[in-house]
Amino acid sequence: MDFRKHLLKILLLLFGLQLSAYAQEFSTAGFYQTDPKVREAINFNVGWRFIKQDVEGAEAIDFDDSNWKVVNLPDGMELLPLNASGGVNYQGPSWYRKHFTPNEQLKGKKVMIHFEGIMGKSKIWINGQLVRENFGSYYPIHVDLSDYLKFGEENVIAVRPDNSNDHSYPPGKPQETLDFTYFGGIYRDVWLITHNDVYVTHPLAVDKVAGGGVFVHFDDLTEESVKVFVDVDIANEGKAKDLQVHLSLKDKAGNEVAKLKEKVNISSDDSEQVKMSFTVKNPKLWSPNHPHLHQLYVTIKDKKGNVLDTFRNRVGIRTIELKGPEGLFLNGKKYPKLLGANRHQDFAHIGHALPNNLHYRDALKLRQVGMNVIRSAHYIQDPAFMDACDELGMFLVAAIPGWQYWNKKEPIFQERMLKDVRNMVRLERNRPSILLWEVVPNETHFPEEYAIKATQFTKEEYPYPGKYTVTDARTHRSKAQKYFDVLYANDQVEAHKQKSIFKREWGDFVDNWVDHNSVSRVAKQWGEAPQVKQAMHYFKEEWMEDGELQEWPSMTMIYGASESLFGATLWHSFDHQRGYHPDPFWGGIMDAYRQPKFSYYLFKSLLPTSGLEDVPHVDAEPFVYIAHLMTPFSPKDVVVFTNCDEVKLTMYGEEIGIKKSTDPNSPVPRVPVVFTDVFKKIDARNKNKKGYGKIDQKWVEGAVMKAEGIIDGEVVTEHSRWPAGRKRRLLLKVDDMGITPQADGSDITTVVAYLVDAGGAIKRLSDEYVRFTVEGEGELIGGVNNEINPQKLLWGEAVALVKSSTNPGKVKVRAEVLKDGINAPSFAEIEFNTVGPKHQLHYTELPQKEQEYIPTPLLVNESEEMKKLRVELQEVKKQLQEYKLNEVGKQQDTFIE
């Protein structure tokens, strides 16, 4: 473990602080707030009225919406069961309305509303006036409300999203024939942005090629210096003014490494793109293992020195070059192959409506297994996920919306797709994480004309080195391949030997594209043998066919490819929903709740044991993991995943052997360690039988399997298994990844319940139902109607999604098995805290808490003291029952003998 991180943890524990007391920071409408009196981002998510149907006249300011449901955004219109594939979700119009009274302090300010994403086509009204009609689901909508607001009285914003199938805008494909799901609603954040009438523009609000907002790029980079170019687009909606543009670049420690001032005169109702440049000496460069981010402060002043606009952006100083057969060069140096996964944004039950912390945790979970590249599938990702990639050192392939569909009949479809290309580059051009621009729809037969325009528009929007577009190398795209910088393929393409290669999707292995049977697609609850097969398939898949060796794209194939192949992304990181198939995609290394399968540990074996000290929340530590449960149905072979040099396996106190985690015949840095034919269920039974009989015994010492991770001849870590015993209790874990939940009315925290034996081993083979309840400053999402609560254990786990309130404080979660009885497993409780939101919340009403289950005390007026005594008595009864059961076990042994 990194000494600095270890010391920090010790200090936090000594001073009684929570390890998770870290409130994550996210960008708002493309910037980070510095002085709210000048430019402010107000959280506009809380208190929207909603109805899941079309309603005539709902745009009117005086429309009666009093019987509508009140929701907080992000909102996906509905909560869905865990399996929501095959068209389960609602498609059609819906309505959102927000009532608010603008603060008098906003008079004279520009007031913008910024929707990060509304699913489908949408219309937006302010006080009954239509201000925007939008076609597209994944790009922000930035609307000026200034001329429509009424101060001192109630205003109403009305939004009508419609996620119905529509061929006229991308993706264009009907959901019932689509390999992902649209879901719906205002599913990303909404911000109210206020600033003066002299301001830096938003790049999507102005139609300027390679302009709008702030544009940063780098040139002449060496370890000694780098040239930084900054374009700032300033609008003046007041009188003509003499202005000063101030730039200040600060490193992570807050040290100012460069500053610059430029004077400019802007006429009334005009704008100017101010071009500035400076040199940074001895720059700290951005890379996956050292993702140094600088803060670029932008301040606009008048000639008297009054601040008219101010904010900051995060930038990472880096250059990339793709040199075909030579591979990827980062900051002028050859960089190893990149390995990662694709990412759809949907989450169990809530669809696309993830709060920022869940997006961040998605990226963090993937980074913690060593991944350093993500392909956006198949649309631009939420800003919070993009922020996370910048911060965690993860490259990203940015993609426009599209999947196996081209509308030949309506020219507007291509026009809108080309607009998506421009908007994508304008939005994400400053991010150090951007590796490739996927400016074509995924797996689609597009015309050559489109290829020409899409690549041309990308170059116009990013006219500097480091811009790389990508398309498939398949033969039916051969006419278009020459226009792109990079090709998607398994390895070097014969017809384009000088082009760099990236593998966009690897691992999936279906029999046909109707049935979708595959060794790669494994629901976690199917158990250990299918999970082991999935992991080993992702490591290597080959077979003999007609006397020839066949190989499928795998980890082995990727690492064994030529240097032309500089990176690859697994299909897919998480299980996700689909429109055209009744089954979800089950090929993730984590399930839809982001809980790991065995293949998760295959990837984690590639995580280094040191060298990631600069990556937040990621500890490069030795680990070893036994992918075996020692059940009566477990396989004979024992597979162990590790990032150590060697693994020593001990069973029942006897050493089985020591094996290396490297293989001279494999190009993969770490291979699965397989101990062949070492587990026999009868041995496990006999060992477990002989050692049992003590009250409160956690496990039978003689029945333990232990793997020890060895580095440089020393044991540095270990992992033990034993046959899971009688299910005794539930155990809860707050899966917050060290990111403290925010009390913003939107944040969601995952709490996992495990059914365990006395020693804490998870009883994977169990089908109990678990009921969750929540007290304090949180609310349980879902209930009986959407199969969320109570919830059946899947592979020994049940998951609660807890939404925070708008008040910071304590949240208490309780889990109990649905059935009652003296021998029922004990309940579990856990508490966590939320912290205040980063931004001001603006709302006039809150959703009502939905409580489907209210525990009834034995006595209606039962006091807290009586309740405590009743619980203690119940625990004593259980302990007595434990003694009785042990005696019964001894009697049965005697009788059988």
Residue ranges and their predicted role:
Residues E25-K52, N67-N103, H114-E116, A158-K239, ...:
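Non-catalytic, glycine-rich low-complexity segments
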Residues F26, G30-D35, D54, Q91-D207, ...:
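Accessory beta-strand-rich segments of carbohydrate-active enzymes
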Residues R39-E59, E78, I118, L178-G185, ...:
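Substrate-binding clefts and catalytic carboxylate motifs of secreted carbohydrate-active enzymes
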Residues D75-F115, M119-N127, R132-F135, D166, ...:
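Active-site-adjacent substrate/metal-binding segments within catalytic domains
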Residues L106-K109, L149-E154, A240, V280-L293, ...:
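Short glycine/proline/serine/threonine-rich loop/turn segments at secondary-structure transition edges
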Residues K150-E154, D231-K323, F832:
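Extended acidic/polar, glycine-enriched regions
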Residues R361-K365, V373-Y601, D619-A627:
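Substrate-binding/catalytic cleft of secreted carbohydrate-active enzymes
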